[in-house]
């Protein structure tokens, strides 16, 4: 009987892991899922189009067929932890795993890929997720929904920023996200203020933080003016957001709209809202993550975005609220800064 039990246990382990090569493990969906934590490095090697249609939460997308695949992986992932890789069926990721193993990575490739994962009914998302940790060790996830819409997950809380359902690809907030503990709205333009989305996210305890105009339009909420501060489960400060270019001043008049600085256990996040490179940005201190808009004529040019980033000096810059603006040259213009180009058109 003891030999039988030992054999069953060995067979089960082989079902989760079957090694191929020194640093490559081909792993079942169950084994892959069991290994995932919020800190697990996960690489999706499918095309950008496949990734946007649906992917594993927290995965980073680097196309196996792009010429600089290995260099891009090296820039995104260290070799100090195992890397979990998948594609549609497991074939591309198997090839990628072999290649990365030769570069010194320990790689786990999911057998059957995304198809096998979804056949089991496991969770997927259409949105990229950026992960951070506060100075006190609390994990923070920022879900990059689209355009100016974000979800910040911190300490079991859901903080929605400028939720909008119908812009671009429809977002079904009622089914894709939990009810929000906090909803932050920067101003009343349609691509930032959507009462239907707010209604889908609202629960009895939800706190809405916005400018005065949106509070009036919604009929509820905590209105903050530029310079106001509030303390909830996190600290928040409303900061100026406005246009400075002649001919654009009417889009976002000074004093009406908000940007926000959130402090989560010491981690400081700047959400700029719709603004140009205004002088008040030089007063922002110790920003860890900055979301800066970059599209004309309503917000900043690439040159203005560079200037704004140079004033703020965030550790991480994530441009957002951009349309057809070409941001490909932005990282080279900000040497030494972690610039992350994501799907936030």
Language-model features: locations:
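Rhodanese-like catalytic fold shared by cysteine-dependent sulfurtransferases
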Residues: 2-5, 17-38, 48-82, 91-128
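Active-site environment of divalent metal-dependent phosphoester hydrolases
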Residues: 166-169, 189-193, 215-218, 228-230, ...
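Metallo-beta-lactamase
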Residues: 85-87, 180-191
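Binuclear metal-ion centers of metallo-dependent hydrolases, dominated by the metallo-beta-lactamase
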Residues: 219-232, 254, 306, 310-345
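Active-site-proximal loop/helix segments of hydrolase catalytic cores
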Residues: 47, 245-311
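Short, polar loop motifs at secondary-structure junctions
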Residues: 45-50, 146-148, 209-217, 225-226, ...
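Zn-dependent metallo-beta-lactamase
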Residues: 20, 126-155, 333-336, 345
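Pre-active-site segment of Zn-dependent metallo-hydrolases
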Residues: 132-135, 149-185, 195-199, 245-250, ...
